[in-house]
């Protein structure tokens, strides 16, 4: 079993064990889809991961007191782009890196609002993006042909990864995974 999938299985088992210790007997993880052989689509050195991590570090250096609200990789449409969004007491910021032109743009998107902090997450507490992308790929039933985008953000009270793959016929499949515990939330194929 490859390390990313093993990591997800270990984290899932740990969550269930902790739930049992704390008396949460109804806790359950989404069933894993068995894929033979398991394919690693990306690793920690893949451009979809390295670029996002580098931009996150740059954002934290520029805004050391900020909390992160989104990290994203987007290759849909053929242009590779990375984005990190965050907020501190002085406002909401977005840092964007365009791979083709090697340009970084930062823009202030608005004023600080207390509600924005509720939509933040600690990037040190989420599952590694490479492991999540590989797990998401396994859920596509072999139909994924390209990694179009991934993002991690707060949605409906949870920090989630949304991973989008291209499929044949210019269609897509979206996979949503809990970014903290690895629970599979949904898999949606374009019709």
Which residues does each PLM region occupy?
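Long, terminal "pre-/pro-" and other extracytoplasmic accessory regions
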Residues: 2-191
């Amino acid at each position: 079993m490859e390390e990313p999938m093993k990591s997800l299985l270990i984290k899932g088992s740990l969550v269930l064990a902790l739930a049992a210790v704390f008396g949460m007997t109804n806790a359950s993880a989404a069933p894993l889809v068995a894929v033979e052989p398991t394919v690693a689509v990306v690793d920690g050195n893949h451009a979809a991961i390295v670029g996002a991590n580098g931009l996150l570090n740059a954002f934290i250096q520029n805004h050391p007191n900020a909390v992160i609200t989104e990290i994203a990789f987007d290759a849909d449409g053929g242009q590779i782009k990375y984005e990190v969004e965050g907020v501190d007491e002085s406002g909401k910021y977005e840092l964007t890196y365009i791979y083709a032109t090697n340009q970084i743009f930062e823009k202030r998107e608005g004023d600080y609002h207390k509600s924005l902090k509720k939509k933040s997450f600690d990037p040190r507490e989420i599952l590694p993006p490479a492991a999540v992308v590989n797990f998401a790929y396994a859920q596509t039933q072999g139909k994924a042909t390209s990694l179009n985008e991934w993002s991690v953000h707060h949605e409906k009270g949870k920090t989630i990864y949304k991973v989008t793959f291209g499929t044949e016929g210019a269609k897509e499949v979206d996979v949503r995974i809990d970014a903290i515990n690895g629970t599979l939330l949904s898999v949606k194929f374009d019709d």
